[in-house]
Amino acid sequence: TLLTEVQVKQLAVDGTSYLKGTIPQDQVKEEQIKSDILVFVEDIYDIHNKTARLSFSTKITDYLSQGRCILAIGPNDIASMEYFTEQKAAIICNTEDEILTRLQNLIENPTLQREMATNARICGEKNHNADMIKKIFFNKVLGDKL
């Protein structure tokens, strides 16, 4: 998504955050590994909620596999946010007002960052392990014929 100059200025805060722009897909995981906090965002203004309600973004499994703290922003009644909440795999912000408070709390509490990173990694290993999913799938499809 291309951002306006105003949006770039709002996101780039001196000493806190910077916007790198676009990177090739093969560099995404490398950049995620370098990050302290991964930010997952859904539409908190209800514009696309009907389509996002039951969606499960592949970005979720990508983030979980990195073993990094996740800050998830979005309404509490959509699948991705419900999943993060149930799994205790992210710090949740359901409104715009919660973002700064939750982010400051994470920055001031490295122990909480590490705990949430561990929760995310464990959730990814437990629920999104490709080998385990293949085994379950083939077992369901082929049953005793394996």
Predicted regions: what is each one?
Residues 142-146:
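Generic C-terminal helix-cap and adjacent flexible tail
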Residues 2-6, 75-78:
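Short, polar loop motifs at secondary-structure junctions
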Residues 94, 110-141:
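A charged, aromatic-enriched C-terminal amphipathic alpha-helix characteristic of glycosyltransferases
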Residues 7, 26-28, 59, 98-102:
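Short acidic active-site motifs
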Residues 31, 102-106, 136, 140:
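CheY-like receiver
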Residues 3-37, 47:
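Nucleotide-activated donor-binding/catalytic signature segment of Leloir-type glycosyltransferases, i.e.
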Residues 26-33, 38-64, 70-82:
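Nucleotide-sugar-dependent
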Residues 57, 75, 87-97, 105-111:
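Conserved acidic donor-binding segment of nucleotide-sugar-dependent glycosyltransferases
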